[in-house]
């Protein structure tokens, strides 16, 4: 919407969100499958036949829940209070489970933090990990991605913006969310130290420590609580991510593509069922693709690496998202060039090495580059070396994205609609109110707008929305009266809740 409500930009951003979310959902599938394998002492979690694969059934269940909770209504901005309450509850469950586990391991299996860390000091692996934790490029890259992910991940944006019902909620989240993260971080080092101490032989993967530790202590209740906490966390994250991405894909790609088909009946009376059906099919497709991604590289990549891969993809939205709020000069072409360049480098420098590690692509490409061209090696693209290979890919992709966004925006001009939208987003409230008071000479009536909206949302919902608008504005809306520019803009925003800003326009 900020960059002129362009269909091509909306479609490309939706594709970036889809591809970037696939590793994120695959991460949750692997986490659940790994947890189940630890509980059942199964050593092979990724090469099982389809109908014997735990992750396959987890994907089916999560797809069903996402369809059930996220596609009951066509209005994308209608708040899913039940879904948000469920996510809030699972957040408390996983925090309770993690804190209980940390306390039990620290004071139940060991004699406190001092005893635990003293025993762990003799472990060479822990010494190596701690020795590497300086304030170098890798740490700054991970911290940057973590900050950007809280805003740019589709599920984060959906919960923070779309599902936000009160402005004061954002003020509360400013201090409550950091406290929540600090509570989780408190026992991270003790649990890692306990795992390295008890499983010094390396026969247990670090990803499985949280379940392996209570199992080693023969604590059935804590093992079950930890598994429930992890499963509930994965379920909540997958459902919200799938719903958010399905809305983007259906609104910006599927529905516009259907409207362009010659055989598609554009005069149909009710598009509401079509929109819901498109979203439900999209949710199933997203979970299927995430499962395929999990099968492709899940066995060869750690949970943390998969998560950071998704964070880096979502970070490509940051220049356009943050710049669009504070810099009026930023335009559509700058976003398109910047995101294309940044996403291409992400795919080449971060996704390709993961696929090479999974034996999907030739191993010699990692150091020697495709066709033996060394400066095309994904871990040192263009001969640049910024920290490790992950830091190199993150910094290069974000840096090129930001540079292209600023440079192209500076050397190209904005369209009229872009200048108007920039003022709406950047300027003060007073400027917003005066910038849209331009003349309207169309012959469209209020009744015409209602008929259009009823195709997608139904007569009852449309009537209620227009009545609410008339009550707020203090102006009666008669079906036969000519629609003002304010009513036109209200209708566009109303349709955007179903079709997205670009399609509604």
Give, region by region, the residue ranges found by the protein language model:
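N-terminal membrane insertion elements
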Residues: 486-492, 499, 503-505
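Membrane-embedded helix-loop-helix hairpins and adjacent transmembrane boundary segments
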Residues: 1-483
